[in-house]
Amino acid sequence: MFEIAKGISNSLAKKSVGAKVDGKNVDMSYILDHDAEVEFIDIDSPEGEDIVRHSTAHLMAQAVLRLYPDTKVTIGPVIENGFYYDFDPVEQFTEEDLEKIEAEMKRIVKENIKLEKYVLPRDEAIEYFRDVDKNKYKVEVVEGIPQGEQVSFYKQGDFTDLCRGTHVPSTGYLKAFKLRTVAGAYWRGNSKNKMLQRIYGYSFSNEERLKHHLKLMEEAEKRDHRKLGKELELFFLSEYGPGFPFFLPKGMIVRNVLIDLWRREHEKAGYQQLETPIMLNKELWEISGHWFNYRENMYTSEIDELEFAIKPMNCPGGVLAFKHQLHSYKDLPARLAELGRVHRHEFSGALHGLMRVRSFTQDDSHIFMTPDQVQDEIIGVVNLIDKFYSKLFGFEYEIELSTKPEKAIGSQEIWDMAEAALAGALDKLGRKYKINPGDGAFYGPKLDFKIKDAIGRMWQCGTIQLDFNLPERFDVTYIGEDGEKHRPVMLHRVIYGSIERFIGILIEHYAGAFPMWLAPVQVKVLTLNDECIPYAKEIMNKLEELGIRAELDDRNETIGYKIREANGKYKIPMQLIIGKNEVENKEVNIRRFGSKDQFSKLLDEFYTYVVDEATIKFDK
């Protein structure tokens, strides 16, 4: 392929790290011996960067073996913006070891070692890893490959690894990488297996992209919700409850504002609210399928010699609530909303602040409808999601449509109807979307909504999921116009996703400086001296009467110190400076977060202004 690319242009040959031959990825060393459609993969393209990242994982493994030859290498996939590789070392790696490994990687890059692919029969591959390489992990991987299949390897100098490819032509292509951290990881993610060491790294096609990403990561570190959550007194985490965050009074204000807003907007949109039990009998989870497919993530308990499970999802309870009463087609659509607390067991190593927890509140809604109502209901949900994401928070977002997977329940006809309804709703609204072929759940297609935060990261939050499974399992019906029983179409949807996770995203998006309507403390009243305190307290009383969340700082500290604390530490949206002039003129001196400018308003004018500033506005 290299010679073909070179025949077109030298620059194409230099920039290509692979090619597609009739849609199949191949290395640049591939010899084309038949007529085919060929497309070269540019190193700077998303697919090209994935090839670079894959090859950088191999580069790191080679460097590790040069430095620590008794280490066993296991697997090393590509992840977003980089890669990782799991190792079984004789002694645990430290952060200092990462510097040595990275330096060795750079030496190997300078050697510009060629990557060569070859294949062995499955049994010979097992023999190689068992007898020559003496690597039980690779033996296990190869044993999972069907009998009779060929197993592909890549060799780069003194290093050989099991791999399907595709890879860069030589190590000289790998010039922009940075090792990030080392962490524990169980072999194949199973806690019954040995704990390995996972080294994470970033990798890009060029140094400029790497530097840009590292700058973003530096900014992300400043915005870390765990750090800001502690500084802003929003929440804390305790060793007595890993994965179970404690919300403090200020954090509860943020949480309750989001929840109250959610409830009001759903009531306006025609939703009825539910509350279903947090713990339900094992039999229910057997009917829903969770007991067989999700058992290891569920918390259980025995009551009166019966086995119960704390709910990991709200859906079965929502189905029971709908099924509890007889429904006519005239009652549909039935929009049932629930802010339900769910519990899911996550491995301790996967827990991350509010982003990955064991207990969280999901803003679920389940809509039961007739087939001819599906598209209109989807349009209604998309508009509601847009109202929150775009008009309230000002988020840009992307939509992905995931279609029927190979293994699925339901007829092709109902899948076609459901996918057409999802796509048709988006087309009708003029929304762009990406299709993920075969990535839907086995029980129905879905739309995923991914919001973009202030530093360009994408977060999957909202989902619209059609479900053919639960109505069938629970035998859910309604009485149609013909007087007969019919199966309703069920739709699951979330907007926030998890309240806790969404708060974590907002903390990082706003870097802790919430918009005024959401801030735990909206106004801080700062006095210059003791003579101003009575006037400041009058203002505080009026703000409380107006429903404004305000605090008074009448400590015997300098005004500069008070401003730095209110502005820099607590990120209060509005600060009022009260001195002699303000008392005499019946006015306030206003300073907004992040600004050094100050301006004055008479009291009556200020009260109108502050109420308007603190009002929730869907107008972004």
Curated annotation (Swiss-Prot):
InterPro entries: aa-tRNA-synt_IIb, aa-tRNA-synth_II, aa-tRNA-synth_II/BPL/LPL, Anticodon-bd, Anticodon-bd_dom_sf, Beta-grasp_dom_sf, TGS, TGS-like
Keyword Ligase found: yes
Transmembrane segments: none
Disulfide cysteine pairs (residue numbers): none
Region ranges (Catalytic): 224-515
EC number assigned by the record: 6.1.1.3
GO biological process: threonyl-tRNA aminoacylation
Single GO term (MF): threonine-tRNA ligase activity
Gene3D superfamilies named among the record's database cross-references: 3.10.20.30, 3.30.54.20, Anticodon-binding domain, Bira Bifunctional Protein, Domain 2, Threonyl-trna Synthetase, Chain A, domain 2
Subcellular location: Cytoplasm
Domain TGS: 1-42
Comment on bound cofactor: Binds 1 zinc ion per subunit.
Keyword vocabulary terms for this entry: Aminoacyl-tRNA synthetase, ATP-binding, Cytoplasm, Ligase, Metal-binding, Nucleotide-binding, Protein biosynthesis, RNA-binding, tRNA-binding, Zinc
PROSITE patterns on file: AA_TRNA_LIGASE_II (PS50862), TGS (PS51880)
Function according to Swiss-Prot or TrEMBL: Catalyzes the attachment of threonine to tRNA(Thr) in a two-step reaction: L-threonine is first activated by ATP to form Thr-AMP and then transferred to the acceptor end of tRNA(Thr). Also edits incorrectly charged L-seryl-tRNA(Thr).
Family: Belongs to the class-II aminoacyl-tRNA synthetase family.
Name of the protein: Threonine--tRNA ligase
Gene: thrS
